[in-house]
């Protein structure tokens, strides 16, 4: 299951030092043979499970990189191994858009620029080398090849990548805390529309203890309410399967004016935001990307409605992203109000 997926590399004059991917795991070994020392590297493939469960009742497991490390003598059987360890490289994630040359073509929009820039991220300079276990020769060689100094190298006794822990639920669910379910505020009625309840009084939600559902319900009502004229919103981070974005798409498809400022430079969420920006545009939303040189961190949603010839506003402001998943994890506040002065202020912002 493992060996056929491995691609061992020996670094010599005919085989230059490979590109070590950001936060990938590698098994490294110093090899001796024919009066010379060489570096051998084996990448731990992402396609392999991070742990292998062992038979028995005690939920025992072994990490996949440990299995590969234990078999390096068979993988490099023509050589004698003097040192071996697991290594991982962290690369710079800060993209300098000017230096990346993504503003060269003024005919392209920011979304195209960001798509180009993200392709460059995986090739940015290393900023950290982590080693599980000290191996002085491997350390010296990797620091030289990666152009790192000793202060950028960390010798660890623990696993370098801890994502494997997410797989432990398959081994023993008793390891987990009891799951907490955010509650729907008892002062709100699930059976009645949320809009008139907001008109009666301000509603303040406290995540993650209270549910995001009242706000999602507000968006759903606005998307389908014939009296709603427009929805304007700023977005920094969205869930992968975002109900917020889907409600905005529905609103646009129902003929409402929907304007969304999508921050494409939300670090590590750039690709997700690019894809949602495309989907919002295809649904008929007007998507803008903010001001060059600035990031938009504000969380504001303005819904404009006409009833009996009068304009009404519902304004939502918050400290947290419009992300249903993280709203169950992070402490944030969400205020929904019908106060006209806040609605007028938000309208000025979006203009």
Model-inferred region functions:
Residues 1-351:
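N-terminal localization/anchoring segments of enzymes in phospholipid and broader phosphate metabolism
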């Amino acid at each position: 299951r493992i060996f056929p997926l491995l691609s061992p590399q020996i670094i010599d004059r005919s085989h230059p030092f490979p590109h070590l991917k950001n936060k990938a795991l590698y098994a490294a070994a110093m090899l001796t043979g024919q009066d010379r020392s060489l570096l051998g590297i084996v990448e731990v493939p992402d396609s392999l499970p991070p742990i292998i469960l062992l038979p028995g009742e005690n939920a025992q497991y072994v990490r996949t990189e440990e299995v590969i490390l234990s078999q390096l003598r068979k993988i490099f059987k023509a050589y004698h191994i003097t040192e071996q360890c697991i290594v991982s490289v962290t690369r710079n994630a800060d993209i300098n858009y000017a230096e990346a040359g993504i503003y060269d073509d003024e005919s392209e929009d920011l979304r195209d620029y960001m798509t180009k820039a993200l392709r460059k991220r995986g090739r940015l300079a290393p900023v950290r080398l982590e080693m599980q276990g000290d191996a002085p020769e491997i350390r010296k060689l990797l620091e030289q090849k990666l152009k790192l100094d000793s202060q950028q190298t960390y010798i660890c006794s623990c696993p370098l990548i801890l994502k494997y822990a997410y797989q432990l639920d398959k081994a023993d669910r008793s390891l987990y805390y009891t799951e907490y379910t955010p509650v729907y505020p008892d002062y709100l009625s699930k059976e009645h529309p949320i809009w008139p309840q907001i008109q009666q009084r301000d509603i303040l939600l406290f995540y993650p203890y209270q549910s995001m559902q009242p706000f999602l319900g507000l968006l759903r009502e606005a998307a389908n309410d014939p009296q709603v004229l427009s929805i304007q919103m700023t977005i920094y981070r969205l869930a992968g399967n975002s109900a917020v974005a889907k409600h905005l798409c529905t609103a646009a498809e129902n003929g409402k004016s929907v304007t969304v400022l999508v921050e494409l430079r939300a670090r590590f969420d750039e690709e997700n935001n690019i894809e949602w920006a495309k989907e919002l545009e295809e649904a008929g939303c007007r998507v803008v990307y903010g001001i060059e040189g600035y990031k938009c961190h504000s969380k504001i949603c303005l819904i404009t409605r006409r009833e009996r010839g009068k304009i009404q506003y519902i304004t939502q402001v918050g400290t947290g992203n419009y992300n249903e998943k993280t709203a169950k994890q992070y402490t944030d506040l969400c205020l929904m109000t019908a106060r006209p002065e806040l609605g007028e202020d938000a309208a000025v912002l979006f203009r």
